[in-house]
């Protein structure tokens, strides 16, 4: 699987494009090549070698979701699919994703849901969530089935903080796939992490110890 230039066709201009080619030479735009269209780390469509696009229900850009789509649309046989690898990039094997609870809100979504893929099936289960305002995480939310109060925090919305919270509060040992939501630019996020590294750890730990 190879990363291509941004897709220029259909209703997803400038979305990231990856091609899955059935041979080892990556011949480019030949008959049989499949293009996976990704926007904000979600698979939103796929295209054939003619550039014809086919919308899909948005799902996190992970190896297992690529497998699901390949089975759905009969792209390749099982043996070929089982050996798909990222060339020049890493495919995520995580079972966990963080996405806006309501897609109608887009980038202004105030609630992001942590979900876990169940038994490598299309279904997912709710694990918890984050309330977000102005790119700040303001509250960590638990499922109603868990006898645990929500926890108020004041943390920058960065990939690093998201994964720290997932580890401390939800015992998740996999990297969270953030999709459907645009995080602050990486340069800014890195600067924030360096500046607040100690205070963020203290805040997460203290809030965790004081939960009730």
Swiss-Prot record:
One of its GO terms (biological process) is symbiont-mediated suppression of host innate immune response. Keywords: Host-virus interaction, Inhibition of host innate immune response by virus, Viral immunoevasion. InterPro entries: AdfA-like. It holds the Pfam family AdfA. It comes from the Viruses. Belongs to the Anti-DarT factor A family. Plays a role in counteracting the host DarT defense system, when mutated at Arg-164. This is Anti-DarT factor A. The gene is adfA.
């Amino acid at each position: 699987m190879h990363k291509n230039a941004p897709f220029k066709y259909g209703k997803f201009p400038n979305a990231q494009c990856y091609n899955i080619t059935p041979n080892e030479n990556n011949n480019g735009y030949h008959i049989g090549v499949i293009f996976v269209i990704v926007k904000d780390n979600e698979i939103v469509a796929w295209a054939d070698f003619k550039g014809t696009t086919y919308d899909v229900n948005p799902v996190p850009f992970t190896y297992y979701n690529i497998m699901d789509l390949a089975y759905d649309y009969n792209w390749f046989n099982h043996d070929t699919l089982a050996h798909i690898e990222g060339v020049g990039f890493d495919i995520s094997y995580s079972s966990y994703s963080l996405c806006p609870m309501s897609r109608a809100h887009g980038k202004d979504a105030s609630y992001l849901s942590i979900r876990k893929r169940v038994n490598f099936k299309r279904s997912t289960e709710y694990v918890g969530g984050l309330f977000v305002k102005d790119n700040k995480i303001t509250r960590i939310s638990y499922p109603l089935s868990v006898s645990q109060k929500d926890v108020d925090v004041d943390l920058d919305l960065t990939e690093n903080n998201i994964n720290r919270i997932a580890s401390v509060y939800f015992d998740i040992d996999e990297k969270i796939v953030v999709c459907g939501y645009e995080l602050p630019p990486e340069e800014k996020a890195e600067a924030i992490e360096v500046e607040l590294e100690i205070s963020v750890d203290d805040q997460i730990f203290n809030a965790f110890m004081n939960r009730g």
